[in-house]
Amino acid sequence: MLRDTMNSWNDSQSDLCSTDHEEEEEMVFGENEDDLEEMMDLSDLPTSLFACRVHEAVFEVPEQKERFEALFTIYDDQVTFQLFKSFRRVRINFSKPEAAARARIELHETDFNGRKLKLYFAQVQMSGETRDKSYLQPPQPAKQFLISPPASPPVGWKQGGDATPVINYDLLCAVSKLGPGEKYELHAGTESTPSVVVHVCESETEEEEETKNPKQKITQTRRPEPPTAALSEPRAFDCAL
């Protein structure tokens, strides 16, 4: 009985271990598949290659040109070629980035007419929107005219109309009732504050004020004259020889 229970316990433990190993393998392989899919994503790669240091016969001999093009037509039937004889380069344009990547991996540094073929990916041409997003944008000129006035008004600026002047008609009416020589109490005084009284002047022009209150003139002091006796008498100089 004890032997049977031990055998059953060992069988259960082995089943548990096998299931754990299977789950771990599934998790590992599942993660590896996701990583492989991410690594095999070739959508960002360019679809063109540049072949550098190409043999001169490719540009001059039609048979060598056909032989060179046959190397790349295996990967893509719709491939096109652009020959730059002065630079000894050929641009190979594929229809898919996968074909360009395979040709780059398999044909790079292979011998062609006694020379190693150098293959490089062409630079990806960015559109206008992506090119603008790759650089830091200047701030929006919404409130820059508040810092310094611009040469021309900003977009959407409209000149505001002048506000109508505020006229206090009650004040004008009170001033018109004032007469010369009289005083008017505006605010009555209290125990802690004095009263405010307005005295109206009798004269209305400055000329009348000057005639009634003439300005005091300051007489300048006369300069003293030199004595006449000192100027009239001749001076004698004694000279002994």
Swiss-Prot record:
The cross-references to Gene3D superfamilies, in alphabetical order and at most eight, read: 3.30.70.330
Q: How does it assemble?
A: Interacts with protein phosphatase PPP3CA/calcineurin A.
Region feature (Calcineurin-binding):
183-203
Molecular function terms, GO-annotated? calcium-dependent protein serine/threonine phosphatase regulator activity; nucleic acid binding; phosphatase binding; troponin I binding
- Taxonomic lineage of this organism? Eukaryota, Metazoa, Chordata, Craniata, Vertebrata
Biased-composition ranges for Polar residues? 1-17
Q: Which family does it belong to?
A: Belongs to the RCAN family.
The protein's name: Calcipressin-3
Q: Where is this region: Disordered?
A: 1-22, 201-241
Its GO biological process annotations read:
calcium-mediated signaling
One GO cellular component, as annotated: nucleus
Q: What does this protein do?
A: Inhibits calcineurin-dependent transcriptional responses by binding to the catalytic domain of calcineurin A. Could play a role during central nervous system development.
Name the source organism: Bos taurus (Bovine)
Going by the entry's taxonomy, the superkingdom of the source organism is recorded as Eukaryota
